[in-house]
Amino acid sequence: MQISDIEVDGYERVARCIDKASGLHALIAVHDTTLGPALGGMRMLPYASEEEALFDVTRLARGMTFKSAVADTGLGGGKSVILGDPSIKSEALFRAMGKFVESFGGQYVTAEDMNIGIPDLEIVKQETAHVTGLSRESGSSGNPSPYTAYGCVVGLVAAVD
């Protein structure tokens, strides 16, 4: 597993992970942790290039910073992306992703997003405690959609005020 940092102005940390054994090619962006650890979902898409994925992960991480601040969650903003075909998933891929998340030492907490479900996150959790939105049976908050919706409503109210 090779993890390397990518310098991006205005971001606390952006990193790339390539793990040939599992086929993982992923990016994590932490925009700001002033208010707390960076929270942001993990998505998996067949990006055309790493540059496209980098644009997406940084844009989304920055958005999470503002959404978290407006909703007064006590969290910062981050995001992760896996570059790949979401129809091709494996335990090894998600275990490697869990190790990548763990390498941030709690600075980034992941959750589900596009093409990532609770079963995928349960595998990630085998390698890191820094994952949320897991099943209620595992002692977590369950489906994060209500919290996402709440954040959107609070953001809209703040924009109107």
Indicate residue ranges for each PLM-predicted region.
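N-terminal ligand-binding/catalytic initiation module
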Residues: M1-G142
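A glycine-rich, Thr/Ser-enriched phosphate-binding loop motif common to dinucleotide/cofactor-binding enzymes
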Residues: S138-V157
